[in-house]
């Protein structure tokens, strides 16, 4: 084996290092998929797509009927990646402060103290996102687009990575509404189980 640059001008040792890195990454992806497959059966294509989006630091929208494993997929993914996860169950009366947090009076210091909401996590499961108001969705939109949240005039940085897996029921289900384009634009993919 000769040393030095190959015909593309790339050093052979650099090529070998890159190939070894790709092999390690492929092995890690395969391990991740195998771990998720323990919890979700028969959904290999969806699991692979979700894995790719996670590697790209994207957000995922899962649309399907209740009971098909959307929540189980998100929870098993967080466990397999050893990420902190939290969940928001969206309802028509969910408020932005239910997502980002709120300030309360600290009786010891007599000052307002910010209490972080569930969005301050690595993997957020936004369950039934199309059941809540557009005002509440806007709070999540900032988090997904910028990795920050603004509450009461202050901006807070979210943990890195920050990934949202949102679920929605089909628009034909009662109590649902179509997500606005500005919200849909924050998701890298929309998948069905």
Where are these regions (language model features)?
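Compositionally biased, intrinsically disordered low-complexity segments enriched in Pro/Arg/Gln/His
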Residues: 5-7
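Pre-Walker A (pre-P-loop) alpha-helix and adjacent loop at the N terminus of AAA/AAA+ ATPase modules
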Residues: 26-65
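Conserved alpha-helical scaffold flanking the Walker A/P-loop in AAA+ ATPase domains
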Residues: 49-52, 106-125
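Walker A/P-loop
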Residues: 55-91
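Conserved beta-strand position immediately N-terminal to the Walker
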Residues: 60, 124, 162
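Short beta-strand-centered segment that lines the nucleotide-binding/catalytic pocket of NTP-utilizing
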Residues: 84-96, 153-157
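Canonical AAA+ ATPase core
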Residues: 106-109, 132-136, 144-193
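Walker B catalytic acidic pair
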Residues: 127-128, 139
């Amino acid at each position: 084996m000769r040393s030095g640059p190959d015909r593309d001008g790339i050093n052979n040792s650099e090529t070998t290092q890159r190939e070894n890195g790709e092999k390690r990454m492929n092995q890690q992806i395969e391990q991740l998929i195998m771990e998720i497959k323990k919890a979700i059966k028969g959904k290999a294509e969806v699991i692979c797509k979700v894995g790719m989006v996670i590697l790209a630091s994207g957000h995922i929208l899962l649309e399907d009927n209740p009971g098909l494993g959307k929540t189980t997929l998100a929870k098993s993914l967080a466990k397999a990646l050893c990420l902190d996860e939290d969940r928001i169950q969206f309802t028509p009366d969910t408020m932005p402060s239910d997502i980002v947090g709120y300030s309360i009076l600290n009786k010891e210091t007599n000052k307002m103290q910010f209490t972080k909401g569930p969005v301050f996590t690595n993997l957020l499961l936004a369950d039934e996102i199309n059941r809540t108001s557009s005002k509440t969705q806007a709070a999540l939109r900032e988090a997904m687009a910028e990795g920050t949240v603004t509450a009461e005039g202050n901006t807070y940085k979210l943990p890195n990575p920050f990934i949202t897996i949102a679920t929605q029921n089909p628009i034909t289900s009662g109590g649902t509404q179509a997500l606005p384009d500005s919200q849909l634009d924050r998701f890298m993919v929309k998948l069905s189980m």
